[in-house]
Amino acid sequence: MEALLEGIQTRGHSGGFLTSCEAELQELMKQIDIMVAHKKSEWEGQTHALETCLDMRDRELKALRSQLDMKHKEVGILHQQIEEQEKTKQEMALEYKEELMKLQEELSRLKRSYEKLQKKQLREFRGNTKSLREDRSEIERLTGKIEEFRQKSLDWEKQRLIYQQQVSSLEAQRKALAEQSEIIQAQLANRKQKLESVELSSQSEIQHLSSKLERAKDTICANELEIERLNIRVKDLMGTNVTILQEQRQKEEKLRESEKLLEALQEEQKELKASLQAQESFILDAKMQEKLQTKLKAVDTKHSVERSLEDCQVERKYSSSGQGVLDNVLSQLDISHSSEELLQAEVTRLEGSLESVSTTCKQLSQELMEKYEELKRMEGHNNEYRTEIKKLKEQILQADQTYSSALEGMKTEISQLTRELHQRDITIASAKCSSSDMERQLKAEMQKAEEKAVEHKEILSQLESLRLENRRLSETVMKLELGLHECSMPVSPLGLIATRFLEEEELRSHHILERLDAHIEELKRESEKTVRQFTALV
């Protein structure tokens, strides 16, 4: 386009002037170039901004997905730690069960040995009936210890009931926590579904934006192609206008030359007409003179002939001289006839040249009329081209207005979508924070409840075993009392063995309680350690 403008300018400078149509076309081409460059820069900036916005959204989505993956990995690690802790707790429970089995085996061995001793002492008691008072005092002491042991067993039973109530309350609390955890898990599942739906909607919106961007790019390409087509059409119109102007100039030059030729021919025609008129007048004068001369000569000849005849008769001797005069007259007549023929040939030639000049004049006038008609047609085509250029300008302005309106609509839609995405990002972040806090609290409470439940179950199992042992011991003591009351003379070694056995059982029960307390403390420490690890991981 610039090359075309430069060519027009150079041709205008070489010609010395620019026509109004060329100036308008040049100004139109400059305006079109400026508009195209401006719109192209605007479209490139807008497309670049849209691409950067889409890249930012893609990066944010990738960051959110990476955070979700990290959270899923942390949850998996926590599940593994919980499974490992459950395995360790199960192993510890198995160890404690094995120890309880060992204790029960020892108790069974002691019972068997006690029964053997009881049988032996009964045999000895049947053979010996001494020191009844000491035995009775020993029995009273043993009964007091048995009462103390019963009181302790009652206290243990009360403590067992308290522990059982605590375990039932903890079990109810665990059930409530389990229900709460199910509710929270359902809420978390709903929130995850909401997050997934939000992600899907954001992805669909991003796809919608990308499709809109592609459509905008397609429209931009279509507009650029339309502008290129219009530019090509304008160039073609410029070329046709230039060719028309060149043809118009050539025809104007031909018209000028033909007008000059016509003027020259008209002058020549005038000259020929004048010369023809002069020659015609000269010929007419010559003809008149010749006619007069011929008439005069004829009259003279008649008179001379008459005279000669008259004189012939009179003067026959003068006959030779009359014959010469007659010859002279005849020669003059021949000369006049030849000159007349020459003049007639010249007149015919001049008439033919006049007819040829008139035909050339007619042809030139016809050519002038045709050229005038062609000039009128060229002016009509030029007006049509100007109207087409105006229409193209209007089309370009309409396309620009429609594109600007569509671009404004796209900008408003993109701003609304960005605001909605920002709000959704805020809601997603708050939901993630609240869900992570609830997950932490729920996991901590569930761990505490599980640990307490395990501890209380173990304590209850141990207390149940102690209660069974106390029952067995109380039954054995009752049997001993019955045996002692039935016997009239108890033996002191039996009381010593019973007191020793009761002291050993009391020590063993204290030892079991201490071990239970140590185990409870150890479980508490482990639960605190796991809670600290979990909080550190979170």
UniProtKB/Swiss-Prot annotation:
Broad class of the protein's primary localization: cytoplasm
UniProt KW Secreted keyword: no
Post-translational modification note: Polyubiquitinated via 'Lys-48'-linked ubiquitin, leading to its degradation. Deubiquitinated by USP36, promoting its stabilization.
Entry keyword Magnesium: no
Gene3D superfamilies linked: 1.20.5.340
One of the record's GO cellular component terms: centriole
Subcellular location: Cytoplasm, Cytoskeleton, Microtubule organizing center, Centrosome; Cytoplasm, Cytoskeleton, Microtubule organizing center, Centrosome, Centriole; Cytoplasm, Cytoskeleton, Microtubule organizing center, Centrosome, Centriolar satellite
Residue numbers of N-acetylmethionine PTMs: 1
Keywords: Acetylation, Cell cycle, Cell division, Coiled coil, Cytoplasm, Cytoskeleton, DNA damage, Mitosis, Ubl conjugation
Coiled coil (residue ranges): 73-283, 343-486
Gene Ontology molecular function: any one: molecular adaptor activity
One Pfam family recorded for the sequence: CEP63
GO BP, sorted A to Z: cell division; centriole replication; centrosome duplication; de novo centriole assembly involved in multi-ciliated epithelial cell differentiation; DNA damage checkpoint signaling; intrinsic apoptotic signaling pathway by p53 class mediator; meiotic telomere clustering; negative regulation of innate immune response
Function: Required for normal spindle assembly. Plays a key role in mother-centriole-dependent centriole duplication; the function seems also to involve CEP152, CDK5RAP2 and WDR62 through a stepwise assembled complex at the centrosome that recruits CDK2 required for centriole duplication. Reported to be required for centrosomal recruitment of CEP152; however, this function has been questioned. Also recruits CDK1 to centrosomes. Plays a role in DNA damage response.
Subunit structure of this chain's protein: Interacts with CEP152 and CDK1; these interactions recruit both ligands to centrosomes. Interacts with CDK2, CDK5RAP2, WDR62, CEP90, KIAA0753/moonraker and CCDC14. CEP63, CDK5RAP2, CEP152, WDR62 are proposed to form a stepwise assembled complex at the centrosome forming a ring near parental centrioles. Interacts with CCDC57; the interaction is required for their location to proximal end of centrioles. Interacts with FXR1; promoting its stabilization.
PANTHER family on file: CENTROSOMAL PROTEIN OF 63 KDA (PTHR18875:SF7), SARCOMA ANTIGEN NY-SAR-24/CYTOSKELETAL PROTEIN SOJO (PTHR18875)
Family note: Belongs to the CEP63 family.
UniProt name for this protein: Centrosomal protein of 63 kDa
